[in-house]
């Protein structure tokens, strides 16, 4: 993931051969408005009450506005290519032990925090995520820099990661209450 993000970090290709890609904020807005994603995310959040911590569930009315704010923040952050749907079923390992991603229909231009938050929050058990997330983010930052990305302070990366957890949550909750259309 860091190789992808580093390769296209603030790349001229984003305004050139990849200029056809939507930004993450535009992609999210189109999905929320045209596909009814926004209401379904809220319904799904409420249907997941049993698995959402009580202190978070009490703030249910704040979740969608916070999600929109986190998506909007992408407009002012440095851009790269983001896959945007990096859950485990979209990963594979090649015969020579390299990792790859499939299902590129959500690919867009945005901040790498989107993919990082999504992959860590959807791929790890809660206890493992809590135990490993800081180390994994530090490793990601090292690889990002080694592949052409910025030298990002951990505190900044931690904030990007946490802000983008709202979008990861929103991307998953509609599966609990699919739109009847």
Task: Locate each region found by the language model.
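ATP-dependent phospho-/nucleotidyl transfer catalytic cores
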Residues: 3-83, 95
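Generic, well-ordered alpha-helical scaffold segments in large soluble proteins
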Residues: 4-7, 66, 85, 119-122, ...
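Regulatory N- and C-terminal appendages and interdomain linkers associated
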Residues: 15, 57-76, 152-181
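Active-site-proximal structural scaffolding
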Residues: 75, 79, 84, 109-112, ...
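Pre-DFG segment of protein kinase catalytic domains
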Residues: 81, 100-103
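Catalytic-loop signature of eukaryotic-like protein kinases
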Residues: 85, 89-92
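Activation segment
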Residues: 94, 99, 107-109
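Active-site activation/catalytic loop segments of kinase-like enzymes and analogous catalytic loops
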Residues: 106-149, 165-181
């Amino acid at each position: 993931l860091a190789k992808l993000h580093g390769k296209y970090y603030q790349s001229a290709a984003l305004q050139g051969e990849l200029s056809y890609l939507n930004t993450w904020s535009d992609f999210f807005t189109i999905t929320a408005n045209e596909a009814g994603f926004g209401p379904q995310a809220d319904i799904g959040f409420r249907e997941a009450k049993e698995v959402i911590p009580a202190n978070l569930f009490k703030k249910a009315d704040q979740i969608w506005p916070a999600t929109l704010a986190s998506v909007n923040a992408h407009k002012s952050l440095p851009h790269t290519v983001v896959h945007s749907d990096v859950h485990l079923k979209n990963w594979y390992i090649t015969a020579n032990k390299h990792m790859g991603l499939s299902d590129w229909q959500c690919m867009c231009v945005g901040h790498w925090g989107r993919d990082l938050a999504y992959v860590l929050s959807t791929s790890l058990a809660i206890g493992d995520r809590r135990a490993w997330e800081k180390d994994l983010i530090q490793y990601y930052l090292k690889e990002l820099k080694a592949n052409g990305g910025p030298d990002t302070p951990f505190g900044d990366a931690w904030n990007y990661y946490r802000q983008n957890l709202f979008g990861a949550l929103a991307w998953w909750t509609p599966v609990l209450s699919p739109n009847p259309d």
